[in-house]
Structures are given as C-alpha cells and as structure tokens.
C-alpha cells in the first residue's frame, strides 16, 4: 500500500514522495549517508554495527505517513567528520521557535527542545520500569518491595513525571492520594499482576480475542505517543494556549476591552461595565430573562437597546443584554458582528468593519492586565476556555 511521506535532502525544502513500505533508501537517494526520522537518527552509513546500505527499506527504518524524513548525502559538508554531528536545520529552527514561544507565553526558562528531551527521557525511564513487570518480579519479595517503595516515593513527589509512561498507575494513585504505603503496595501488586497477565496472554495465546484486544490497545498507545512527539517537534505552536480575541473600544468616554465571540448569539455587557459607563439608567428591565449556554444558565437583568460604541474614530450603535456576571466586561456577539458587517481577520489579527474601520486584536499581556486590574479578578481566576491561565 502506497502513501506519501515528507522528505528533505541536505536541508532543502520538504517534498512529498509517494512510497511504499518496501521502498528502499536507494530509491529515494542512492548517495544517502545519514537519515533522520523526526527527531532521531535512523540510518548512519558509518555505523559498522548495523548493515546499512541502499537496500534498507522504509519499513525497516519505521517510516510512516506522518514521519518527517531528513536525508543527507555525500555532497553535504561535515567539517567535524562525525556524521552524527549533523542536525537538520528545520529541527534547530523549531527548537529555537519553541524556546522563544515558551518563554513569551508560558514564562518558562527552558527550551521546548529540552522539554521534548525530558519527555523522551521520562518515557524511556517509565517504559524501562514497565518492562521490569514480570512474573519473576512478583516472585521476588525483596525486588518487588524496593520497586514499590521507589514508585510510592515518586508518585508522592512527582506524579506528573510518571504520567506519560504509566498513566493507569498514576490515575489509580491520584484517586486516593492519602493512601498509606501498605495500601499502595497492595494496589501496586494488583497493577503489576494485571500487566503481567496481559503480556502472558499476548505471548501464550496471541490469536485469542483477549490478546487481540490488549495488542490493539498497545498499538493505539504507541501511535498516540508517536503523534504526540511529532506534534511537539514539528508543531510546537499547538502546545501554546491560544489568546482569545479582544479589542479596545470606548463607551461614553470610558475605555472598555471587549471580547469578540462569533459563537454567541447576542452581545452582553456586565452590570459593572454598565455602571462604570453611566448606562445603568438605560437598562430596560422588562427584558429580564434567562440565558442558557455552554457555561450554564445565567439571569439577564435587562437590555440596553441603543448604545453608542466608539471603535477607533468610528461610532456604532449596538444593543446589549445586561448580566450581573463580572468575569467578562463586554462581549460582542454575532448580532452586532453581522449588523455592522464585521470580518474577523486572523491573518492580519484585526477586526474589520463593513465601513472600512479596522482595529487590532489585543496581545495576551494586555488581556491579562485587563482581567487583573479593570475586572479586579484574583490571578487564579483568570482562566480561559482551555483552562490555561
């Protein structure tokens, strides 16, 4: 079965190549001396311990349709003489971008490359410990006790580091974090016995329905891990919380930061914002009702039928439902966006109005400042839809 894979030669641009699992390295490039797959070297002609050559197939190198393949040939300079000193330019750029993005958005001092390396080390450590789960371990009280004590200490102090390779064990532990060591030892023995039982079924009766179920779960986890690593390496921006869309505007001379939400049917103003802008007396309380949405049900205190909103140098008349909620000052919903022919231009990061007025979306630091200072919210309450602060 053929599939397409992304291939870059000597730090050149990626090209899509139609290949099959039996496609050889010689078919791709007969002068290949070093090949990276994603973030690891999988082909090194100088490695005498392995029989590398043009006849090696992509299947032998573990190349799949989501793999990124970097090929280096005899024409690529290697001043150090060590082929393994060659690192793909794309990987270096991704690491630099991820490091900068991590520092800006998450305030982390370490680079994403170091983070990915730590993730791989944790994964390898956890898988190494998991590979120790055997009948021999269960039959050796001293060895089992030493391992269970080590696991108990790590789960008490750094469960997140075990969550990648041993998620089920971490989940069981966190369900009862205050358990004693004796209780943990019993739970850990039960967990190890289950894992050993699965491996024994797969080994002794691979064609059984139970074995096939275990194998499928194992393959799915491997695929998830591969996709996660691929995403961390080639799409690090996906790991950064997206900044929600806010704009600056003015109501009655009072500056307001408005949240742009094209998924909201109506536009909403908080009672605090209405009072701050001197609009409290214009609330028509005959329009009291209940609003139902993803966040639950909230009471609408009334409606402001016509509110003059100034964006840049233009004025727009907007209706607003008024709520007592304080988590959001002002929400511009679809009714106002459609009324004024607005376009959310993510390419230029601006909100464009039908009359030609445009205004930029705010940066994350401006939004944080708004939530803390204007809304007077504690920092721990500043949570966006994805749960990030």
UniProtKB/Swiss-Prot annotation:
Q: What is the effect of changing residue 293 to R?
A: In mg544; defective expression of the proteasomal subunit rpt-3 in a pbs-5 (proteasomal subunit) mutant background
Instruction: State the EC number(s).
Output: 3.4.23.-
Which Gene Ontology molecular function entries are recorded, alphabetically? aspartic-type endopeptidase activity
What is the superkingdom listed in this entry's lineage? Eukaryota
Phenotype upon changing residue 261 to N = In mg572; restores the levels of slo-1 in erg-28 mutant background
Its name, as the record gives it, is: Protein DDI1 homolog 1
Q: Name the segments for region: Disordered.
A: 109-132
One GO CC term, this protein: nucleus
Q: Which InterPro entries match?
A: Peptidase_aspartic_DDI1-type (IPR019103), Peptidase_aspartic_dom_sf (IPR021109)
User: Does this entry carry the keyword Hydrolase?
Assistant: yes
- What happens when you mutate residue 277 to S? In mg555; defective expression of the proteasomal subunit rpt-3 in a pbs-5 (proteasomal subunit) mutant background
The record's family statement is: Belongs to the DDI1 family.
Any Gene Ontology biological process? proteolysis
Q: Where in the cell is it found?
A: Cytoplasm; Nucleus
The top EC class, named as a word, is: hydrolase
Primary role: Aspartic protease. Required for the cleavage and activation of transcription factors such as isoform a of the transcription factor skn-1, which in turn regulates the expression of proteasomal subunits such as rpt-3. Plays a key role in the degradation of the potassium channel slo-1, perhaps acting directly, in cleaving slo-1 upstream of the ER-associated degradation pathway (ERAD), and also indirectly, via activation of the transcription factor skn-1, which mediates proteasomal homeostasis.
Deletion phenotype, per the entry, is: Increased sensitivity to low doses of bortezomib which causes proteasome dysfunction. Double knockout with proteasomal subunit pbs-5 or with rpt-5 knockdown results in failed expression of the proteasomal subunit rpt-3. Double knockout with pbs-5 also results in the occasional mis-localization of the transcription factor skn-1a within gut nuclei.
């Amino acid at each position: 079965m053929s599939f397409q894979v992304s291939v870059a030669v000597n730090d050149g641009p990626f090209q899509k190549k139609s290949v099959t699992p039996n496609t050889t390295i010689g078919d791709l490039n007969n002068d290949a001396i070093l090949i990276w797959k994603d973030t690891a070297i999988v082909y090194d002609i100088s490695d005498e311990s392995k029989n590398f050559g043009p006849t090696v197939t992509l299947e032998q190198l573990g190349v799949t349709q989501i793999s990124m393949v970097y090929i280096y040939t005899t024409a690529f300079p290697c001043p150090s003489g060590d082929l393994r000193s060659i690192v793909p330019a794309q990987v270096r750029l991704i690491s630099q971008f991820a490091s900068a993005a991590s520092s800006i958005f998450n305030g982390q001092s370490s680079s994403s490359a170091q983070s990915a390396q730590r993730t791989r080390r944790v994964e390898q450590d956890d898988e190494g410990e998991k590979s120790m789960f055997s009948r021999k371990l269960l039959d050796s009280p001293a060895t089992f006790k030493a391992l269970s004590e080590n696991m108990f200490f790590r789960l008490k102090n750094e469960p997140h580091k075990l969550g990648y390779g041993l998620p089920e064990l971490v989940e069981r532990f966190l369900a009862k974090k205050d358990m004693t060591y004796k209780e943990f030892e019993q739970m850990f023995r039960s967990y190890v016995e289950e894992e050993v039982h699965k491996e024994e079924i797969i080994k002794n009766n691979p064609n059984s329905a139970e074995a096939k179920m275990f194998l499928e779960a194992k393959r799915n986890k491997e695929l998830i891990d591969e996709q996660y690593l691929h995403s961390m390496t080639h799409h690090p921006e996906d790991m950064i919380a997206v900044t929600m869309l806010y704009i600056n505007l003015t109501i009655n001379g009072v500056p307001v930061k408005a949240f742009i939400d094209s998924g909201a049917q109506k536009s909403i103003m908080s009672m605090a914002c209405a009072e701050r802008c001197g609009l409290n007396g214009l609330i028509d309380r005959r329009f009291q009702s209940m609003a139902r949405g993803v966040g639950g049900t909230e009471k609408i205190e009334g409606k402001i039928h016509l509110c003059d909103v100034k964006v840049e140098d233009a004025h727009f008349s907007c209706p607003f439902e008024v709520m007592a909620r304080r988590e959001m000052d002002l929400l511009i919903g679809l009714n106002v966006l459609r009324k004024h022919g607005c376009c959310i231009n993510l390419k230029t990061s601006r909100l464009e109005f039908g009359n030609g007025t445009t205004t930029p979306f705010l940066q994350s630091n401006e939004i944080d400042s708004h939530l803390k200072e204007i809304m007077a919210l504690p920092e721990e309450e500043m949570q966006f839809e994805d749960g990030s602060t």
